Amino acid sequence: MSKLIYIMGPSGSGKDSLMAEARLRLAAEAPVVFAHRYITRPADAGGENHVALSRAEFQLRLSRGLFALSWESHGFAYGIGREIDIWMESGLSVVVNGSRGALSAALQAYPELLPVLIDVPEHILRERLGARGREDAGEIEARLVRARMAVVEAPELVRFDNSGPLAERGQALAGLILETTISGRKS
């Protein structure tokens, strides 16, 4: 049974690495695809593999209804393409890299989605943000403040601890995705 699995978490929680690890483990196991995001950020900016768009191209796509979900964060625009609807209609479960701030809109558009909040202690967030070298000290502090923001509560919200070894946590996320896909349950 197809499901939309909405992964979210603060910068530095390890979403990109965790999703990449889970994707490797699910490659031949399940009818699951991982959606790419359209972002107004250069393709070589590091982090996830995404489709880089100019602001003008993003706005054009947005105005034509080509995004199933979209939001703004940290000075960039993010979109998830409408292709996810076709994938789910064909029986595939879809994993998306979402935003905590956009969860409410995502739940309105896809009430059956499974929201998964990637959670790590603040000291690990600080270490990871510093190690990736994309932000200065002030930007790191701002991201840590934002990390404390409340998440829209959803009855099926899964809080996923990502403070352990990547291989172990990636396997656990792959297991959650596989269980959700096979059983059709939300949690």
Swiss-Prot record:
Enzymatic reactions: alpha-D-ribose 1,5-bisphosphate + ATP = 5-phospho-alpha-D-ribose 1-diphosphate + ADP
Pathway: Metabolic intermediate biosynthesis; 5-phospho-alpha-D-ribose 1-diphosphate biosynthesis; 5-phospho-alpha-D-ribose 1-diphosphate from D-ribose 5-phosphate (route II): step 3/3
Enzyme Commission (EC) number: 2.7.4.23
Residue positions binding ATP: G9, P10, S11, G12, S13, G14, K15, D16
Gene Ontology terms describing biological process: 5-phosphoribose 1-diphosphate biosynthetic process; organic phosphonate metabolic process
Sorted UniProt keywords: ATP-binding, Nucleotide-binding, Transferase
Statement: the UniProt record of this protein carries the keyword Transferase: yes
Enzyme class: transferase
SUPFAM superfamilies tied to this protein: P-loop containing nucleoside triphosphate hydrolases
Matching InterPro entries: GK/Ca_channel_bsu, P-loop_NTPase, PhnN
The keyword Nucleotide-binding is annotated on this UniProt entry: yes
GO molecular function, one term: ATP binding
NCBIfam families (UniProt xref): phosphon_PhnN (TIGR02322), PRK10078.1 (NF007485)
Similarity comment text for this entry: Belongs to the ribose 1,5-bisphosphokinase family.
Name by which UniProt lists this protein: Ribose 1,5-bisphosphate phosphokinase PhnN
Native organism: Desulfomicrobium baculatum (strain DSM 4028 / VKM B-1378 / X) (Desulfovibrio baculatus)
Gene: phnN
